[in-house]
């Protein structure tokens, strides 16, 4: 807190100083069973010094089989864990002591299967189906819709109370990628995903996560035209479309008292902003010269 912050109406919410380290040992082994089949296995672990959180054993497996004629199938799965945003550990009680030093890692189990087909002239198609179960997610002790699974979906920081690792959630979806590598002065890349993302806070109600737009589509392409002996004109474009971000109704009275945005638990993330759409066009000119 200083003269500049006082003039702007800012005040110190938390003031904490400390050090932390995240240690992540891992071992990975790849076995080429045959010319058509590969198998990858690994074990990951991590230790967070700030809270003494330990994840001693996170196995991860991957398998791929080439069926010939440019086709391949794959499958994989594994356990993962991650720390929380650093500032959330520094929540302070009225006596100044940090109140979230008992927070553990968020954890997840991932699985997926895929298929790909390569054609002549640099053209290929890939598709993948996946499922992720998220658990050990920090949520409030008192029943509410809050979950750390949604933190990071916006630009504001959340000054939450003490948290416990009892929340969970899941994601599942289907991805499709169609790609043509640059050949004969032309390329394109299409990727599309349809998915569902749900979570459960300490009130045990399933809700949309803030990221649950349900679909994302991207298209990128370009073409070059030779002009004369030394010049090239390029035309390219990119189109992105995605489902709108989820949101809820603001609790105006509580937000005013707390001096930050507090959402109502009822209907949280039931509402959705309009879908996102963006299109970009690029035109370029390139000239090759012996002196350049």
Report residues per predicted region.
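Transmembrane beta-barrel strands of outer-membrane/channel proteins
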Residues: 1, 41-47, 63, 75-79, ...
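Repeated loop/turn-to-beta-strand initiation elements of outer-membrane beta-barrel proteins
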Residues: 36-39, 70-73, 121-125, 184-188, ...
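Conserved C-terminal beta-signal and adjacent last beta-strands/turns
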Residues: 208-292
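Gram-negative outer-membrane beta-barrel transporters
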Residues: 36, 131-133, 158-244
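Outer membrane beta-barrel strand-and-loop segments of large Gram-negative receptors
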Residues: 13-24, 100, 104, 124-187
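Residues on the lipid-exposed face of transmembrane beta-strands in outer-membrane beta-barrel proteins
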Residues: 25-29, 61-65, 113-117, 174-180, ...
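Surface-exposed extracellular loop regions of Gram-negative outer-membrane beta-barrel proteins
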Residues: 17-51, 56-60, 65, 69-111, 131-161, 178-196, ...
């Amino acid at each position: 807190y200083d003269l500049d912050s006082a003039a702007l109406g800012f005040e110190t919410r938390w003031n904490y100083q400390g050090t932390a380290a995240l240690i992540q040992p891992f071992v990975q082994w790849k076995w080429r069973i045959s010319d058509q089949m590969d198998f990858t296995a690994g074990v990951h672990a991590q230790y967070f010094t700030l809270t003494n959180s330990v994840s001693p054993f996170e196995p991860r497996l991957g398998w791929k089989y080439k069926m010939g004629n440019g086709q391949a199938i794959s499958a994989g799965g594994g356990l993962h864990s991650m720390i929380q945003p650093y500032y959330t550990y520094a929540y302070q009680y009225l006596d100044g002591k940090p109140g979230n030093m008992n927070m553990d890692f968020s954890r997840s189990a991932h699985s997926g299967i895929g298929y790909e087909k390569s054609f002549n002239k640099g053209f290929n198609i890939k598709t993948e189906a996946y499922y992720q179960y998220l658990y050990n997610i920090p949520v409030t002790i008192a029943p509410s819709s809050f979950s750390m699974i949604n933190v990071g979906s916006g630009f504001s920081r959340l000054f939450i109370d003490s948290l416990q690792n009892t929340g969970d959630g899941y994601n599942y979806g289907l991805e499709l990628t169609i790609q043509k590598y640059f050949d004969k002065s032309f390329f394109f890349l299409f990727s599309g995903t349809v998915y569902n993302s749900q979570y459960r806070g300490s009130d045990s109600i399933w809700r949309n996560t803030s990221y649950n737009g349900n679909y994302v589509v991207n298209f990128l392409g370009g073409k070059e035209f030779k002009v004369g002996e030394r010049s090239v004109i390029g035309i390219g474009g990119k189109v992105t479309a995605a489902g709108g971000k989820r949101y809820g109704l603001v609790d105006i009275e509580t937000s005013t008292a707390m001096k930050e945005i507090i959402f109502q638990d009822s209907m949280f993330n039931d509402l959705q902003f309009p879908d996102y759409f963006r299109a970009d066009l690029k035109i370029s000119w390139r000239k090759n010269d012996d002196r350049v």
